[in-house]
Amino acid sequence: MLGESVPAAVEQEQLGEVKLEEEEAVSPEDPRRPESRLRPEVAHQLFRCFQYQEDMGPRASLSRLRELCGHWLRPALHTKKQILELLVLEQFLSVLPPHLLGRLQGQPLRDGEEVVLLLEGIHREPSHAGPLDFSCNAGKSCPRADVTLEEKGCASQVPSHSPKKELPAEEPSVLGPSDEPPRPQPRAAQPAEPGQWRLPPSSKQPLSPGPQKTFQALQESSPQGPSPWPEESSRDQELAAVLECLTFEDVPENKAWPAHPLGFGSRTPDKEEFKQEEPKGAAWPTPILAESQADSPGVPGEPCAQSLGRGAAASGPGEDGSLLGSSEILEVKVAEGVPEPNPELQFICADCGVSFPQLSRLKAHQLRSHPAGRSFLCLCCGKSFGRSSILKLHMRTHTDERPHACHLCGHRFRQSSHLSKHLLTHSSEPAFLCAECGRGFQRRASLVQHLLAHAQDQKPPCAPESKAEAPPLTDVLCSHCGQSFQRRSSLKRHLRIHARDKDRRSSEGSGSRRRDSDRRPFVCSDCGKAFRRSEHLVAHRRVHTGERPFSCQACGRSFTQSSQLVSHQRVHTGEKPYACPQCGKRFVRRASLARHLLTHGGPRPHHCTQCGKSFGQTQDLARHQRSHTGEKPCRCSECGEGFSQSAHLARHQRIHTGEKPHACDTCGHRFRNSSNLARHRRSHTGERPYSCQTCGRSFRRNAHLRRHLATHAEPGQEQAEPPQECVECGKSFSRSCNLLRHLLVHTGARPYSCTQCGRSFSRNSHLLRHLRTHARETLY
C-alpha cells in the first residue's frame, strides 16, 4: 500500500495534459463530464497509469478502473473478438524487437493481422536500414515508451506548439529499486522564442513529490509477484521522469497530446496550426527528447536511448551561433491529425509478391487472382468463388432461378442490381442526355457507348429520338468485315480475330509465336489452343470432356455454356427480343439479326471467286464455298450421310432420335424443324404471305408461288424455275423433287421399308398406303 505521502490527485497531476485536452473538447455549457467523452487512447493512458489512493477507497478505485477500461475498450461498440484483438495487439507490440517496432511507425494499426503483414513485407525487403537502438543505458528495452532521454554535448532549440513554456531538465540515470530520482538543479533561465519550452525558475514546484518513487512504492507493495506486463516498469519510469519535471502551470490549456502508438481512435487536430522548422519524421508522435546537461561540472555524461523517429535529427546551435550549454530544451512533437501511412511499408501478397497500400486491396487481390483462396466450389461446373454469396448468385445460372420480378412488366432477374437497372427503363425521362444529338439514355454505360459511335464517325449524327421509337441496335461497325456490334467491347473482341489472322499470315517465326503465347497465357493441354482468359479455357475444356452442365428444364437438353441455354429457352417461350428496325422482323439471337441487316443494303466485303456472290461475314462465305467444292465435313454417325453445315446435320439427326421439339399451340402437332411449325401454323390462321403480282393469287409457301409463276411465263420468257432433266433418260421435270423421285426408278433404291413384313418401297406414300393394309384400313 502507498503511504499517506502520495497525494490524492496524483492521477490527475501525472496526466494533467491529457485531461486538459479533454476538457477543451467539451464546451463549458456541456453538462457532461469530460471523462464521458474520453477517446480510447486517452482512456488507455489513464487506465495504465492509474494508482490506488487512500482517500478514494477500494470500491471507488475499482469503479474508476472499470470506467477507464470501458472508455478504452468500449464494450458497447466492440465485440468480444475486437476487444480481445486490442489486448493481444498491445501485448504483441510490447514484445516486438526495437528495430521492427521502429519500422512500424506511421501505420494505422487496427489488428494483429495488419502488423504481421507489414512485418513480413519488411523481411522480404532486399536491404533495409539497420536496427535502431532503443535500449536505455541500463540495458532495459522500452519499445512502447513515448519518452526517451538522450544526452549530447549540446542542447538545441526546437519549435513547439505552445508559447513560452518552462521545463526543467533531468539528468538521466539508472534507478535502482530503492534509489530516489535526483531533483532537477535550478539554472538560470534564458529568454526563449515563442513556441519553445524554456527552463522554469527555481520557484516553481513539480506536479508531484516524485512519480518515480510512487511507481517504486507500487512495485514494492504489490503482493501479486511479477507484473503481467514486463514493459510497464521501464515505460512508466520514463514517463514519470518527464512528468516530474512538469509543473501544473506549464501545461497549456489548448495542448494536444500525441496520439497513442497503437493508433486507437482518431484525434481532432487543434485549431492552431503548429509550424515546425524541422522536417517531419513518421506520423506517429515523435518521442520526447530531453537534452541533458552534459557540460555541467561534476555530472558525468552517459549515453542514452535514441529517438524512435527516423526523421528526427539532433538539434544544432542556437540563432546566436553559440551552443546552449547552460540551458536544456525539452522537444515535444505532436502528431498532426490522423497518422499518415508510411509509403515504404505496404501489404505484400505472399503468393505473387504484388504490394498494395491497403489491406482491403490485398484481400480482394487474393480472392480474384489466386484460386487457392476460393473455398466455395460449384458442384455443377467446378468453378470456385471466394464468397458464399457469389456462389449463391452463380448457382442461379444453373437452376435459372430469377427471384427478382419487375412489378410493372413482370420481367424477372437473377440479381437485384439487374432489376434496379431495368426499372430505369420505366421512368418517364432519361437520366443521361447526349450533348451532340440530344438523345436520352437511362444508363450511363449506354450513353458512353453512344458517344463512342460519335467519336468513330461510323454513322451520321442522329436526331433526338422520342421515347416511342425503338433505339437502333447497331452502333459500331467493324472496318474489316462490316459486322455490326452494339457494344464497343464486343467490337474489340471481334477485332482480335482479324489481328490473329493477320499475325498468322504475316509471320510464322518463333518470335511471333512467343508474342502470341504472351498474349494468351492459358493453353489447353489437349489441343494446344490458347486463350486470354481462364474462364474461356474452362469453357473450352468442356469440348474435350463432353461436360454439359447447363440443362433445359423444359426438354432436358444440355449445353456447355449458359448463353446457349438462354438462347435455347427462347424456343420454348417464343421470345424474340431482337427486332429489325427497318422491316420489323424479330429474331431469337443477335447474330441472326446482324445477318439479316445485311439484306437491307449492308456492306458485303467478302466475295466468292467462282460465282461472284458477296457475303457480309467470312463464315457465310466459307459455308457457300462448300457448295462449289462439294465438301461435306459434317457426317451422321448413324447412317454416314454427309452435310455441308452442322445445322443441317443436327436437323437430320432428329430423324434417328425421333425428337420433335417444336409443338403447335393450337393442335399439339409436333415438328422437327421450326420452319415446318411456322408453315403449319398458317393452316390455322389462314395466312398466305406469298402473292402473285400478276393475278393476285396468294400461297402459303414460297415453293408454291414459284410453281405458279411458271404458268404465267411466256414462251420466250425465262421461267422462274428452270426445267430439271434426268441424266439417264433425258426426261425433264418442272420440279426438282419430281426429278429425285424419278431417279429412284433408275437406281432401284427402296429406302422406305415396312417394319412388320419387311417389304420396301421407293416412295414414302407407297409405304403409308401399304401400312393401312396391316391395320385393315382402306382409303376409299
Swiss-Prot record:
Q: Which compartments does it reside in?
A: Nucleus
Entry comment on modification after translation = Methylated at Gln-483 by N6AMT1.
Sequence ranges assigned to domain SCAN box in this UniProt record: 56-126
Q: What's a single GO MF annotation on this record?
A: DNA-binding transcription factor activity, RNA polymerase II-specific
Superkingdom in the source lineage = Eukaryota
Cystine bridges: which residues? none
Keyword Zinc set for record: yes
Task: Write down which residues bear the modification named Phosphoserine.
Answer: S162, S208
Q: Sites of the modification N5-methylglutamine?
A: Q483
Matching entries from InterPro entries are given as: SCAN_dom, SCAN_sf, Znf_C2H2_sf, Znf_C2H2_type
Q: Which GO terms describe its biological process?
A: negative regulation of DNA-templated transcription; regulation of transcription by RNA polymerase II
Chain segments carrying region Disordered: 1-38, 153-237, 255-324, 492-520
Q: Where is the composition biased (Basic and acidic residues)?
A: 29-38, 268-280, 498-520
Instruction: Name the principal localization, coarsely classed.
Output: nucleus
A cellular-component GO term for this protein: nucleoplasm
Q: Where is the composition biased (Polar residues)?
A: 202-224
A Pfam match is zf-C2H2
- Keywords for the protein's UniProt record, in alphabetical order: Disease variant, DNA-binding, Intellectual disability, Metal-binding, Methylation, Nucleus, Phosphoprotein, Repeat, Transcription, Transcription regulation, Zinc, Zinc-finger
- Positions modified as Phosphothreonine? T268
Q: Which disease is it linked to?
A: Otofacial neurodevelopmental syndrome: An autosomal recessive disorder characterized by mild to severe cognitive impairment, delayed or absent speech development, and behavioral abnormalities. Affected individuals have outer and inner ear malformations, hearing impairment, and variable facial asymmetry.
Q: What is known about its subunit structure? A: Interacts with POU5F1/OCT4 and SOX2.
Q: Explain the purpose of this protein.
A: Embryonic stem (ES) cell-specific transcription factor required to maintain ES cell pluripotency. Can both activate and /or repress expression of target genes, depending on the context. Specifically binds the 5'-[GA]CGCNNGCG[CT]-3' DNA consensus sequence. Regulates expression of POU5F1/OCT4, ZSCAN4 and ALYREF/THOC4.
Q: What is this protein called?
A: Zinc finger and SCAN domain-containing protein 10
Task: Report which gene this protein is encoded by.
Answer: ZSCAN10
